[in-house]
Amino acid sequence: MNFETIIGLEVHVELNTNSKIFSPSSAHFGEDPNANTNVIDWSFPGVLPVMNKGVIDAGIKAALALNMDIHKEMHFDRKNYFYPDNPKAYQISQFDEPIGYNGWIEIKLEDGSTKKIRIERAHLEEDAGKNTHGTDGYSYVDLNRQGVPLIEIVSEADMRSPEEAYAYLTALKEIIQYTGISDVKMEEGSMRVDANISLRPYGQEQFGTKTELKNLNSFSNVRKGLEFEVERQAKLLRSGGVIRQETRRYDEANKGTILMRVKEGAADYRYFPEPDLPLYEIDDAWIDEMRAQLPQFPAQRRAKYEEELGLSAYDASQLTATKALSDFFETAVSLGGDAKQVSNWLQGEVAQFLNAEGKTIEEIRLTPDNLVEMIAIIADGTISSKMAKKVFVHLAKNGGSARAYVEKAGLVQISDPAVLVPIIHQVFADNEAAVADFKSGKRNADKAFTGFLMKATKGQANPQVAQQLLAQELQKLRD
């Protein structure tokens, strides 16, 4: 029997506001334990939450970017559960009226086709703290993360393969990153993914019993965990077994999923409206203000790069991987840079440098202006493509004018025949044996002179001009 795979994803995204959702404490990542806390985060008696308007702004932007309807009257709810990293014994979240609902995004599949994935809802909530279980037998609670604003984006169960889930996450991450509401760094926990997967016989409308997957700390692991579950569940069903509703975690070391707990039924969190927060009215003016702040998104930029600039689909995809890179590219082209040459540099030397340094393009000194200037002085023969690599490294580390650096460092390419011909004659005088080999007709003897000339000019001879002049002067020797 063959089975159809049914996948839905729940994605938690930390919003990059300066302060937390209901307290003035810093929401920044990486501080000492409990450094970013105050009485609200610790839930001292009598303290009240105060809404951070920037969180609602971010929620509206996310809803618009994901083609969602927006609840014009929005409220928060209490989700009741007890855990040490949740000092209130409830989480302030949204239940029946999330900020966004009925959305969708389009994904691109490996065969080049596209598919629309529906998004059920996107709701705002506060994050919980973090428990650390020490080797000394004690557990430690860090509430720096307590109250950091989240938006949870819940897809419909529209994905039919692990590959589609991977494509969905890639597209979702791009869109959220372009809005500027989150850096979506999985390694820092600002994007976290839970997956729900079930199988059903082809032709059956009713969903099978779902399994929830956790500990998915990369898109690659999401795909691997889902692939393992497809095989595990199919094997179990074919042998006459029954799928239990359970939560499993992906174990990277064993390349498989491991049981965490069996779910006897749906959790009863006893949601009720949060009495300490008012109803928030989101009018059209507020929505229009947030819409005006949204950029052009990756899909539209890719289409523009292919149709208007003549780039390949691959180049367009690489250049839109992040908004910062795409903005850099567009600025460089607007300054007169050739689109293909700018693209080649960004995907070649620039990408290699960023990977080696572990930096993003915003974190180096290279600018669109000095990259375009460098490309121009390659084109006019001031420097060679080989020398440009050295110039680029200087610009990436120090910034400034490419032309000014080339002139100051003495890197200007020698193209003047009046300068090169005497150097060629000196090369002949210094290498009599090579001249004798050439005159005697020894095979490939002429090729040695190119190296001699480049050494004599410290690599500054224009290769094209040098080859022409060498051929001319060698012919005179033969004559």
From Swiss-Prot:
It catalyses: L-glutamyl-tRNA(Gln) + L-glutamine + ATP + H2O = L-glutaminyl-tRNA(Gln) + L-glutamate + ADP + phosphate + H(+); L-aspartyl-tRNA(Asn) + L-glutamine + ATP + H2O = L-asparaginyl-tRNA(Asn) + L-glutamate + ADP + phosphate + 2 H(+). It comes from the Bacteria. It is an enzyme of class 6 (ligase). GO terms for biological process: glutaminyl-tRNAGln biosynthesis via transamidation; translation. Gene3D superfamilies: 1.10.10.410, GatB domain, N-terminal subdomain. Keywords: ATP-binding, Ligase, Nucleotide-binding, Protein biosynthesis. InterPro entries: Asn/Gln-tRNA_amidoTrfase_suB/E, Asn/Gln-tRNA_Trfase_suB/E_cat, Asn/Gln_amidotransferase, Asn/Gln_tRNA_amidoTrase-B-like, GatB, GatB_C_1, GatB_Yqey_C_2, Gln-tRNA_amidoTrfase_suB_CS. Its EC number is 6.3.5.-. GO terms for molecular function: asparaginyl-tRNA synthase (glutamine-hydrolyzing) activity; ATP binding; glutaminyl-tRNA synthase (glutamine-hydrolyzing) activity. Allows the formation of correctly charged Asn-tRNA(Asn) or Gln-tRNA(Gln) through the transamidation of misacylated Asp-tRNA(Asn) or Glu-tRNA(Gln) in organisms which lack either or both of asparaginyl-tRNA or glutaminyl-tRNA synthetases. The reaction takes place in the presence of glutamine and ATP through an activated phospho-Asp-tRNA(Asn) or phospho-Glu-tRNA(Gln). PANTHER family: GLUTAMYL-TRNA GLN AMIDOTRANSFERASE SUBUNIT B MITOCHONDRIAL AND PROKARYOTIC PET112-RELATED, GLUTAMYL-TRNA(GLN) AMIDOTRANSFERASE SUBUNIT B, MITOCHONDRIAL. Heterotrimer of A, B and C subunits. Belongs to the GatB/GatE family. GatB subfamily. This is Aspartyl/glutamyl-tRNA(Asn/Gln) amidotransferase subunit B. The gene is gatB.
